[in-house]
Regions:
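Catalytic-core segments of class I nucleotidyltransferases/pyrophosphorylases
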Residues: 50-51, 58, 64-71, 84-87, ...
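A structural micro-motif
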Residues: 21-23, 48, 75-76, 150-152
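Conserved N-terminal catalytic core of the sugar/cofactor nucleotidyltransferase
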Residues: 1-54, 60-65, 130-133, 166, ...
Length: 197
């Protein structure tokens, strides 16, 4: 886990509710951007490919299907995308034939595609060689757009994308989370181990 602001609260919660795994944390003392945080955490990454998830959003998908898709495509990078979102402040992803990513624009002024970046990525370790040589940088603005020349694919999911990046969206998501008609994959953990929100 890469943590920053309020990182102690996140580390404490996962320390108490870790289940059958040992969580590892990299605390960023200063903002590094999404890319800088991933680059700093790479010293702990042992798998190839490796999974990156945004911590302020939730989009349900089957990680095994994502991995099979990534492997079948021989992808260097795979991004989960959804059309089940009406917000304008998400990354816009254009897919071509065979789900190849043709463009990725973070929060464009004018949206010309229906696919939204779901904040879930699967990367081959070789992508690390493309990381910018700076301490603070954006995965969405500086790495993903340049990957369009690589085997970079979009994994389409019909799942809704929930963002808790603003106080208003957090309030909305808390209501959705409490709705018994909405199922989340972590609901049983939520009920057994206490509130995540």
């Amino acid at each position: 886990f890469s943590t920053g602001y309020k990182g102690d609260m996140i580390e404490d919660w996962f320390g108490r509710h870790r289940g059958g795994y040992e969580p590892l944390f990299v605390r960023d003392r200063a903002p590094l951007g999404t890319g800088g945080a991933v680059a700093r955490a790479m010293k702990l990454v042992r798998s190839n490919p490796f999974l990156v998830l945004n911590g302020d959003s939730l989009c349900e998908l089957d990680p095994e299907r994502l991995l099979r898709f990534h492997t079948r495509k021989r992808a260097r990078a795979t991004i989960a995308v959804t059309q089940a979102d009406s917000r304008e402040d998400t990354g816009a992803v254009t897919l071509g034939e065979d789900d190849r990513v043709l463009s990725m624009v973070e929060k464009p002024r004018t949206r010309t595609t229906g696919y939204h970046n779901a904040g879930i990525y699967l990367f081959d370790r070789t992508v690390e060689a493309l990381f910018p040589n700076s301490r603070s940088w954006s995965l969405e603005r500086e790495l993903l757009p340049q990957l369009v020349t690589e085997p970079f694919y979009g994994f389409v999911t019909a799942s809704a994308l929930y963002d808790i990046g603003t106080p208003e969206r957090l309030v909305h998501f808390r209501e959705v989370w409490k709705d018994p008609s909405v199922h989340f994959p972590v609901t049983s953990m939520h009920q057994e181990q206490g509130s995540l929100l």
